[in-house]
Swiss-Prot record:
Residues 6-67 form the S4 RNA-binding domain. GO terms for molecular function: DNA binding; ribosomal large subunit binding; single-stranded RNA binding. It comes from the Bacteria. InterPro entries: HSP15 (IPR025708), S4_RNA-bd (IPR002942), S4_RNA-bd_sf (IPR036986). Residues 98-131 are annotated as: Disordered. This is Heat shock protein 15 homolog.
Length: 131
């Protein structure tokens, strides 16, 4: 028995990477989705065992297609359609850790500046413009 054919945009929607098929289509067309290390078209028929690279915001995921589905199900069932590679998980964790540590090193004020402090800040920022 032959497996059913599923389009790339429909599979991404069914696997819950994108909320709508039109968003999935837009991401594929803009080059944020690569199928087996090549830019893909929306109507590409996906195969079990293929590798996908997805860019979502600051994150880049590498996933392997394990199963096919053209119906959107709950999140636990959708996660059974793919498996993220170990290197991808590790890379995303390192980036998240670096982003977290970077934000911790920046000083954050305890409170908002009052009126006098705001004026002083504005003077300081614009002091070269008036000289």
């Amino acid at each position: 028995m032959a497996e059913k054919e599923v389009r790339l945009d429909k599979w991404l929607w069914a696997a819950r990477f994108y909320k709508t098929r039109s968003i999935a289509k837009a991401m594929i067309e803009s080059g944020k989705v690569h199928y087996n290390n090549q830019r893909a078209k929306v109507s590409k028929i996906v195969e079990v065992g293929a590798m996908l690279k997805l860019r979502q915001g600051n994150e880049e995921k590498e996933i392997k297609i394990i199963a096919l589905s053209d119906q959107r199900r709950g999140a636990p069932e959708a996660q059974l359609l793919y498996q993220e590679t170990e290197s991808s998980v590790k890379k995303r964790e390192e980036i998240a850790w670096a982003r977290k540590n970077n934000s911790l090193s920046m000083p954050h004020p305890d409170r908002r500046p009052n009126k006098k402090e705001r004026r002083d800040l504005l003077k300081f920022k614009h002091q070269d413009k008036f000289e």
